[in-house]
């Protein structure tokens, strides 16, 4: 079968990391590109399970989903090990994507001219190089802070070493380019802390080594958030483009499901009075921390909206739901973007995952951070010490007293007003960045010109 590539028609292979919140923002970007470049074919390659969810609603005709094997053998029984599904996928991903790209070319009869991939798929750099085509990775999972640290992993390891790491968490590192200082204990997992030989840690290390080879590196952020780090990253990459926040460039429709009535309930609350509690789809507080949050909310009489999995409700103090039925609302899921945009929300108690950070900046809501893993610690460091738009819960875990102190500080203390003012300032910068003449909009147009061949 003849495979062609005409000068007017391009073919971009989009390789997704099919876990957590990675695929959604990537597809959102591709949707924007597809609308602006109708002659370009975008072949979106992810697992069948991921694609089934992503493509349940109509997409532009020039975006086509294709499957890649998830690496789970037939009849496999999961042992519930950490990152078990990710590790299975990573073992077969390189070969799987290579075969999928070959199949896509046969079906479309159009040779792939670009590889746009989640940066977690570092091996896609080699795939693009073998084909002699451009590689455009996108850092979906974090901001410039975590990207910079992974870029300088070797420098950090050589400078800090590995001895006695467990007792050095509070040591301040002042040699990482772009950071005035950073607490050692807030480095992302896989740099110095955690199992450095795990497939996930190895993947993160290889990302930092591969990214300088990219034609263009994209990031789900906006330039004005991290000007110093952006200078460093610009000096390391041929082209570095902030094209977010994706929650503002591709906002969710207002008709998003609110089956549990969160928004009508919020409408009955006082302005900036409610604590919204949510830890994303992966992070999960321990039972004693669920108890601590509940006791702090009740003791402080803080109105609350809590997105809490049904499996965790069993850990709530006996009688808590009945005693606080007028004070708060617990739901298994909440439309977070809409919730954070509501005027009654005064604080967001969060794990500080990157999407949650961007969404709360867009809502102008200060944070109380409780990091769990991955980039949560470094995001929390930035929230408290650099951007000054929130606080880390004392000791990094929830106790009744630490949670009450954090709530009082953000909702009642003078510092809370400063946090609110600062995040309001960042909100305005983010909105300006995605405006018609904003930095993220200009960067998107730059990317569009590169892909369509008008700015090679």
UniProtKB/Swiss-Prot annotation:
It comes from the Eukaryota. It catalyses: cyanidin + UDP-alpha-D-galactose = cyanidin 3-O-beta-D-galactoside + UDP + H(+). Expressed at low levels in stems and leaves. Expressed in ovaries. It is an enzyme of class 2 (transferase). The keyword Glycosyltransferase applies. The active site is at 22 (proton acceptor), 118 (charge relay). Pathway: Pigment biosynthesis; anthocyanin biosynthesis. UDP binds at residues 281, 333-334, 351, 355-356, 359. Pfam families: UDPGT. An anthocyanidin binds at residues 20, 22, 83, 150, 374. Its EC number is 2.4.1.294. Keywords: Flavonoid biosynthesis, Glycosyltransferase, Transferase. GO terms for molecular function: cyanidin 3-O-galactosyltransferase activity; quercetin 3-O-glucosyltransferase activity; quercetin 7-O-glucosyltransferase activity. GO terms for biological process: anthocyanin-containing compound biosynthetic process. Gene3D superfamilies: Glycogen Phosphorylase B. PANTHER family: GLUCOSYL/GLUCURONOSYL TRANSFERASES, UDP-GLYCOSYLTRANSFERASE 74E1-RELATED. Involved in anthocyanin biosynthesis by catalyzing the galactosylation of cyanidin. Required for the accumulation of anthocyanin in red-fleshed kiwifruit varieties. Seems to be the key enzyme regulating the accumulation of anthocyanin in red-fleshed kiwi fruits. Belongs to the UDP-glycosyltransferase family. This is Anthocyanidin 3-O-galactosyltransferase F3GT1.
